[in-house]
Design a protein with these regions (language model features):
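C-terminal end-helix/capping segment
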Residues: 90-92
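Mid-chain, well-packed structural core segment of small domains
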Residues: 58-88
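Short S/T/G/P-rich N-terminal loop/turn motif that feeds into the first structured element of a domain
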Residues: 1-55, 64-74, 94-118
Length: 118
């Protein structure tokens, strides 16, 4: 079971690039499905948020093993796609995330460091 994730979030689509952004989104879904099929990631979940007045309009949460996702982040194709997405949406971000058992392990590490410092 996955212990780590990549949170890929984005904001408003760049004006005039709406069609391109939709095409890139659909292509990205196929890309993630291919990564899942190859075993490079465990799963992914695209999410589109309701209008809420904030900057975050959607995200994809990719789940997998920390080492595999670390390799993915420096993969040239992943980098190319991230750069391309950043040209059609605002506020694109890729952030590592603890998920599943990783949350418990992260909290244990946090507690240990807290205990050492207090």
């Amino acid at each position: 079971m996955a212990d780590y994730g990549l949170f890929i979030g984005w904001g408003q689509v760049t004006r005039g690039r709406e069609k391109t952004a939709l095409d890139e989104f659909n292509d990205g879904i196929q890309y993630y499905a291919g990564l899942q099929e190859k075993g490079d990631i465990e799963s992914f979940e695209p999410v589109i948020l309701e209008q809420h007045g904030g900057d975050l309009l959607g995200f994809v949460l990719i789940r997998g093993e920390r080492e595999k996702l670390a390799r993915l982040r420096i993969d040239r194709e992943f980098e190319r796609r991230t750069i391309r997405a950043g040209l059609v949406v605002n506020s694109l971000g890729v952030v590592g995330a603890l998920v599943g058992q990783g949350v418990s392990e992260g909290l244990v590490t946090y507690q240990q460091q807290l205990d050492e410092l207090t």
